[in-house]
């Protein structure tokens, strides 16, 4: 009997506190606080700044062009002509050519 009273009181306090927080959130915007006509300017970080926990300086603008591959040059093999297609007896579909070589997802 005493535990049900305690649970009812705690539930009542929970609902009241929730109601207070919601009412402050909804009606807190209509308070009579003065609006600042001159907001503070946005602070921008320089291009070279120090990140704590790192030994090196982090550069925001970095030129990645030396690392980009030349799009005109291709290291991939040329596609073989589609003359020798075989049917897989297990699945009854055409066998696919599986590329060989290192996995491109691993460096």
From Swiss-Prot:
InterPro entries: CLE9-13 (IPR039618). GO terms for cellular component: apoplast. Residues 1-25 form the signal peptide. Glycans are attached at residues 29, 102. The keyword Membrane does not apply. The modification Hydroxyproline is found at residues 99, 102. Keywords: Developmental protein, Differentiation, Glycoprotein, Hydroxylation, Secreted, Signal. Residues 79-107 are annotated as: Disordered. It comes from the Eukaryota. The keyword Plastid does not apply. One of its GO terms (molecular function) is receptor serine/threonine kinase binding. Residues 87-97 have a biased composition (Basic and acidic residues). GO terms for biological process: cell-cell signaling involved in cell fate commitment; maintenance of root meristem identity; phloem development; regulation of cell differentiation. PANTHER family: CLAVATA3/ESR (CLE)-RELATED PROTEIN 10, CLAVATA3_ESR (CLE)-RELATED PROTEIN 11-RELATED. Belongs to the CLV3/ESR signal peptide family. This is CLAVATA3/ESR (CLE)-related protein 13. The gene is CLE13.
């Amino acid at each position: 009997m005493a535990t049900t009273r305690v649970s009812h009181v705690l539930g009542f306090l929970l609902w009241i506190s929730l109601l207070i927080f919601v009412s402050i959130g909804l009606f807190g915007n209509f308070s009579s606080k003065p609006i600042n006509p001159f907001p503070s300017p946005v602070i921008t970080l320089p291009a070279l700044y120090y990140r704590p926990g790192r030994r090196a300086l982090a550069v925001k603008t970095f030129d990645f062009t030396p690392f980009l591959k030349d799009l005109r040059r291709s290291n991939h093999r040329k596609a073989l002509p589609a003359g020798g297609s075989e049917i897989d007896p297990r699945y009854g579909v055409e066998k696919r050519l599986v590329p060989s070589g290192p996995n491109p997802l691993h460096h």
